Amino acid sequence: MDFPSSLRPALFLTGPLGLSDVPDLSFMCSWRDALTLPEAQPQNSENGALHVTKDLLWEPATPGPLPMLPPLIDPWDPGLTARDLLFRGGCRYRKRPRVVLDVTEQISRFLLDHGDVAFAPLGKLMLENFKLEGAGSRTKKKTVVSVKKLLQDLGGHQPWGCPWAYLSNRQRRFSILGGPILGTSVASHLAELLHEELVLRWEQLLLDEACTGGALAWVPGRTPQFGQLVYPAGGAQDRLHFQEVVLTPGDNPQFLGKPGRIQLQGPVRQVVTCTVQGESKALIYTFLPHWLTCYLTPGPFHPSSALLAVRSDYHCAVWKFGKQWQPTLLQAMQVEKGATGISLSPHLPGELAICSRSGAVCLWSPEDGLRQIYRDPETLVFRDSSSWRWADFTAHPRVLTVGDRTGVKMLDTQGPPGCGLLLFRLGAEASCQKGERVLLTQYLGHSSPKCLPPTLHLVCTQFSLYLVDERLPLVPMLKWNHGLPSPLLLARLLPPPRPSCVQPLLLGGQGGQLQLLHLAGEGASVPRLAGPPQSLPSRIDSLPAFPLLEPKIQWRLQERLKAPTIGLAAVVPPLPSAPTPGLVLFQLSAAGDVFYQQLRPQVDSSLRRDAGPPGDTQPDCHAPTASWTSQDTAGCSQWLKALLKVPLAPPVWTAPTFTHRQMLGSTELRREEEEGQRLGVLRKAMARGQLLLQRDLGSLPAAEPPPAPESGLEDKLSERLGEAWAGRGAAWWERQQGRTSEPGRQTRRPKRRTQLSSSFSLSGHVDPSEDTSSPHSPEWPPADALPLPPTTPPSQELTPDACAQGVPSEQRQMLRDYMAKLPPQRDTPGCATTPPHSQASSVRATRSQQHTPVLSSSQPLRKKPRMGF
């Protein structure tokens, strides 16, 4: 490392930073009271190695970035938007417009959609007052509510104002029991937690600090044409992909094969690479003093290898690329409070600086382990609620920079704890705006010594960009208002297109905006902008390259292209035929899509030759317009087809519906417990590999009898078999014989027959019309309901003995005499045939006359009963 020959005024202190007798100038009200900077000396034509006379302009090969890799199969959810969190109605009596979070709507949605989460703790507290199964408790009727009946009441409850609205006793007891808790404790505590979560979500929408620094890196390969892109993938971004890419001169970059994958335990937030060359190690030996050479012991690194550092939320790891350019894990560590930044040392291979949310900064190397060098939970300049910390290296191997939202401080790792010097702070020294905060700090030591000094540091805020020299603290060498609509979280210092040329600086916003600056300032001159800044196309500018789509698919594509940018990488491909090489930019979106864009240098003499003052903000110079080719549109169409095959994100979680019909009873719960025990025994037997016996499963469930076959209405055989199958064959046979199994009816039947026979003695003939129209007796079934006697085969003759079966012995003689007077019936076989209605009536009347008993004179005369037909 060679410092410039002529140095600008600087602070030379003896001993460690912050521990010398010289008064500390970092807390002065203004640096103008102590120091003045000389004006930049005009450069002569001979010494003007910087080609600022012809400003460089990068021309994009396409109007927008193109997709390089096919979309991942994992669905992507864009998450919350500002419209979901803000209050839509206008707030009255407010002088200044302010952002108002709609807590009322959010808490109502939370109670409806996530009722199990909101009321689960209350359910456990009030479990003794609810009966979830079976019948209600008889001993605690006043303090125990049946959930099943309560759900029934709530299901039929009508809102107030309805004439059928009512409140049951259970609902009244439930409101008395849960009113004090549900009305005050849940609403107040849940509103506080929800408001805190909404504030965090709103801050995350404004600034997502998790991916500060970028999660996309380029690892050079064995030859200049080959390399690897390292980026996270997956729905949770917990898979680290290593995609090999070939850079062909005059053609688009192509990926080779499928990427290598490493599964991690958390989402990847930052990826940093650093190449280790043999020349750089020899240069370190020549620069370092004698007391630092002990740190440069020969390590396991190959002279031409690369290192890869990955930061997750609570883990950090380092990989090494050896001769075969395959990643080999060196070491991994866990950060309890959460990691916010990781940086690789450009001086000592394998050394890293790690920051945590607790305010601690540690040096970590696979050989020496972890060593804490700084810890301060408070911010540097003024109080700020953010716990974000950032660390980087400087031109000196043992001096680091630590940054937070209020400023940047330099630390001496060899000095006592707490010593240091402020490098940059937000305030009047830098003419900062109100509410301005530091978003990113980066060491620009990888710049070319002929373009920029190796002691520059980049400080980015949400409004401006600052260049600070570590040799002159608190003095911004350059301030420029970038004007990006989204937070500036990505910055890459690119190699110059040709020797002794201006050096491009690429800036990337969280919303996908890209800007390209050209920095110049070698020797003792102040760094300045060599030409106006240039705005590069973003991913949303590639929308015209896709075919016309339906509105729904078009909206999905736009949402995918508008995903936040979480990674940025730049590569200079080898172009032997061209005098100035081009530039390939890679972008990584939060959806996991990788886009690329080629830039070609173009000299434009119409631009201004001398840059204005550092503080002036010039209008952006847009790149020359290009046109889409058929190959570009075909590639976009193919990528779109693959995107449409990706399933959509799962729908928003909806509240489950509960019904009392699906609640289990005590027997069903017992059956479920027995089945669960059997499954547990089966799993244990399978795990041990032993034989499962019947006694291990308990008693077998009682086998239910098979269902009886369905019997027809007119098939007597089927009816008889069905009754016999059910075990009621004897009863069926008795019914067919005209008998009954009830003893009470058997005792009352002769008496009833006597009364009916006396009634029949009043008239010898019964009118059929009166018989059918009169109501039936309640104790005598209708004629069609009486069981029919079994049919007589046609071979049997109609004899008095055959028809007298089932008739008492004292009445058989009368029946024989009556049957003897009847004419023979040849058409109807047997007495099973039903006679005509008039004939049946005359038969019943004759039988009643024959059965009439003689009343004795001693018995009183009874009232004549009416006919029961």
Curated annotation (Swiss-Prot):
Organism: Homo sapiens
Key word Nucleus present: yes
Post-translational modification Phosphothreonine, affected residues: T834
Assembly: Component of the transcription factor SL1/TIF-IB complex, composed of TBP and at least TAF1A, TAF1B, TAF1C and TAF1D. In the complex interacts directly with TBP, TAF1A and TAF1B. Interaction of the SL1/TIF-IB subunits with TBP excludes interaction of TBP with the transcription factor IID (TFIID) subunits. Interacts with MYC and RRN3. Interacts with p53/TP53; the interaction prevents the association of SL1/TIF-IB with UBTF and represses RNA polymerase I transcription.
Xref: PANTHER family: TATA BOX-BINDING PROTEIN ASSOCIATED FACTOR RNA POLYMERASE I SUBUNIT C, TATA BOX-BINDING PROTEIN-ASSOCIATED FACTOR RNA POLYMERASE I SUBUNIT C
Disordered: annotated span: 605-629, 729-869
Role: Component of the transcription factor SL1/TIF-IB complex, which is involved in the assembly of the PIC (pre-initiation complex) during RNA polymerase I-dependent transcription. The rate of PIC formation probably is primarily dependent on the rate of association of SL1/TIF-IB with the rDNA promoter. SL1/TIF-IB is involved in stabilization of nucleolar transcription factor 1/UBTF on rDNA. Formation of SL1/TIF-IB excludes the association of TBP with TFIID subunits. Recruits RNA polymerase I to the rRNA gene promoter via interaction with RRN3.
GO cellular component: fibrillar center; nucleolus; nucleoplasm; RNA polymerase transcription factor SL1 complex
Sites of Phosphoserine modification: S848
UniProt GO BP: transcription by RNA polymerase I; transcription by RNA polymerase II; transcription initiation at RNA polymerase I promoter
Full protein name: TATA box-binding protein-associated factor RNA polymerase I subunit C
Pfam families: TAF1C_beta-prop (PF20641), TAF1C_C (PF20643), TAF1C_HB (PF20642)
Keyword field contains Transcription: yes
Polar residues bias locations: 835-860
Top-level lineage group: Eukaryota
Subcellular location: Nucleus, Nucleolus
UniProtKB keywords: DNA-binding, Nucleus, Phosphoprotein, Transcription, Transcription regulation
Sample GO molecular function, one term: RNA polymerase I general transcription initiation factor activity
